Regions:
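N-terminal glycine-rich flavin-associated loop
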Residues: 8, 32-64, 68, 86-133, ...
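Flexible, glycine/charged-enriched surface loops at secondary-structure junctions
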Residues: 15-20, 63-68, 127-130, 207-226, ...
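Mobile "lid/hinge" segments at catalytic clefts and subdomain interfaces of large enzymes
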Residues: 139-311, 343-349, 516, 523-529
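Extended, hydrophobic alpha-helical segments in both membrane/secreted and soluble proteins
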Residues: 68-70, 77-78, 116, 146, ...
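Terminal amphipathic helices with adjacent charged low-complexity linkers/tails
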Residues: 292-410, 535, 548
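Short amphipathic alpha-helices in soluble, non-transmembrane regions
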Residues: 8, 55, 286-290, 360-372, ...
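N-terminal flexible segment immediately upstream of the FAD-binding catalytic core
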Residues: 1-66, 73-103, 155, 252, ...
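Intrinsic disorder at enzyme termini
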Residues: 510-550
Length: 550
């Protein structure tokens, strides 16, 4: 579109840029992909966002490629924050964080979680669905991807903490989205305007396919694929909650401009048991036994992650500073000596919390005693305070950043990075997925949320080579088929984006995929919001935009 920059500059109060530096920055996120936009816009207000949506809707028929994609920190691993038209940078100005009021707090989507959390902790509260990228992600990305993390085992995902949203829909107006009872829903559907018709059409779609939609819900503890229609309308409670659909829609149904989160009390005391597993033979039973003790968090990472953490030890200086890094090194010495006697196949982190340190210590000790019969006790380290286990938490939380920033000859290729399998199947599943990794000669680390069976497998590849890129599709197909054969999900946290959007139909089947397409049409008939994700994603398009240079 000619003069796009000038038209947008005259329209909004925010910034509009088409500088080479800004376009390059916005052309990629943390995924495999690179798409150069026409312009990058930084709105200064929700009114600016509404004007942008209205502008694109008005000119879409004349300029079919015109569209909008929201972006904040650019940490999306699925390619959800890239677009060849207009990138809307929410992270520059829309960063206001309100005050805690009871068990809730309101914030704009561009706020970093690292700035958001201290405000809640001052009141003894926490929004617990933060991902491992908590230091670099924004709350808007958490909502749009329906993020989860180490505390999701106990508390659930971001969709469980969204109380209310301000959303700009395709007509360019801003609407409040929150749970409605049946009387409120009926009144909404009777309005006869854009909003009323949206609610009416969505309600009728869900009602007409109620049983099919409910049965389509993935049988796993966490999921970020498709559209979560099964959580929107419940006949028994007669609650219609559109926030459950917007959370995880990856910006394909509208633009979130304000969020009201629910909060939980933050833990007073924590303690972690670190387990070094010599082998994975009894992993399934160990997981079942651990879950009986109801830990707050149950994480794990493999021997490749552990070895890389030692090899790239100086990376931690950026996170911890020189003194912190040296302290970490001293703490790691005993473990380094243990590793000389044999690298564990997996490191488990089992965290408990409680009202007193005595309660936590007892729970950690009981967990250790329950696992002692498995014969791994020589490699146990019991941690009765969080500080002692901090070194392992750093390895777990920083694992992707270590790979992304510090392995020079290869690049992170997150394409099988977020699969979920019911935990009872992990002893069979993990060796099988490692066979596929080895078959395609991929160097890959495995880390994840053991209690949810949610694993982040991150291959390191020379992705600029055609021979390496040719591995992506067949390897992904094999892993996807394996995951689905165990009743799993293709994404627990990172969402669909460019990388998994093409496989939604494979996961849900043609009928449910057709219902998803109807949802997209109800909200965004002209496809102005974040194209090539979810229902209009194709592998052909994704493949054309794999990043060539890093």
């Amino acid at each position: 579109m000619q003069d796009l920059k000038q038209q947008l500059e005259s329209l909004i109060d925010g910034d509009v840029s088409d500088s080479q530096e800004e376009l390059e920055r916005a052309s990629h996120d943390a995924s495999l992909f690179e798409i150069v936009p026409e312009v990058v816009v930084a709105p200064k207000s929700a009114e600016d966002v509404a004007k942008l949506v209205e502008f694109v809707a008005k000119h879409k028929s004349e300029h079919p490629n015109l569209s909008l994609t929201a972006r904040s920190a650019g940490t999306c691993m699925s390619g959800g924050a890239v677009n060849e038209s207009i990138i809307v940078d929410m992270n520059k100005y829309l960063t206001d964080i309100g005050e805690v009021e009871g068990d809730e707090i309101t914030t704009q989507p561009g706020a970093f979680y690292r700035d958001f959390e201290p405000k809640t902790l001052k009141h003894g509260k926490l929004m617990p669905s933060y991902p491992a990228s908590r230091e670099i992600c924004t709350v808007g990305g958490m909502v749009n991807n329906n993020s989860g993390g180490e505390k999701s085992l106990e508390y659930g995902k971001t969709e469980d903490f969204v109380r209310e949203l301000e959303v700009v829909f395709a007509d360019g107006n801003t609407y409040t989205v929150k749970p409605l009872n049946k009387q409120e829903l009926d009144a909404k559907m009777a309005q006869g305007d854009f909003e009323g018709n949206l609610y009416k059409e969505l309600y009728e779609l869900i009602e007409a396919n109620y049983d099919a939609i409910k049965s389509a819900k993935p049988n796993v503890s966490k999921d970020s694929t498709g559209y979560h229609l099964w959580n929107v309308w419940d006949r028994e409670t007669e609650v219609f909650d559109l926030t459950k659909l917007i959370a995880g829609a990856q910006g394909t149904l509208g633009f979130v401009t304000n969020i009201r989160f629910g909060l939980v009390p933050s833990a007073t005391h924590k303690g972690t048991l670190v387990v070094f597993l010599r082998d994975l033979d009894d992993l399934g039973q160990i997981i079942n036994d651990v879950l009986k003790h109801k830990p707050a968090t149950f994480e794990g990472f493999d021997n490749y992650t552990l070895m890389l953490s030692f090899k790239l030890f100086f990376f931690f200086r950026k996170t911890l500073g020189w003194w912190g890094m040296m302290k970490l090194g001293l703490q790691l010495l005993p473990d380094a000596f243990k590793l000389m006697r044999g690298i564990p196949k997996m490191v488990l982190l089992i965290e408990f919390d409680g009202e007193t340190q005595e309660e936590v210590s007892e729970r950690v000790h009981n967990m250790r005693e329950a696992l002692r019969p498995y014969g791994h006790e020589a490699l146990f380290e019991e941690n009765e305070t969080e500080a002692k286990s901090r070194k392992f938490w750093i390895m777990r939380r920083q694992s992707f950043q270590i790979l992304r920033k510090k392995v020079k000859d290869k690049h992170t290729a997150p394409f099988i990075d977020d699969l979920v399998v019911p935990p009872e199947h992990l002893p069979e599943f993990l060796p099988e997925v490692r066979e596929i990794i080895n078959k395609y000669e991929l160097l890959a680390t495995i880390a994840g949320h053991m209690g949810d069976g949610n694993f982040h497998i991150i291959p390191l590849m020379e992705i600029e080579k055609q021979s390496e890129r040719d591995k992506l599709e067949p390897a992904m197909k094999e892993v996807n088929e394996l995951v689905l054969s165990y009743g799993g999900s293709l994404s627990g946290e990172h969402n669909d984006g460019l990388i998994r959007g093409p496989w939604i139909k494979q996961m849900y089947g043609a009928d449910m995929f057709g219902i998803f397409k109807e949802v997209k049409h109800i909200f965004d008939a002209d496809n102005i919001f974040n194209p090539h994700k979810k229902t209009d994603a194709t592998w052909e398009y994704a493949k054309e935009h794999i990043r060539q240079e890093f």
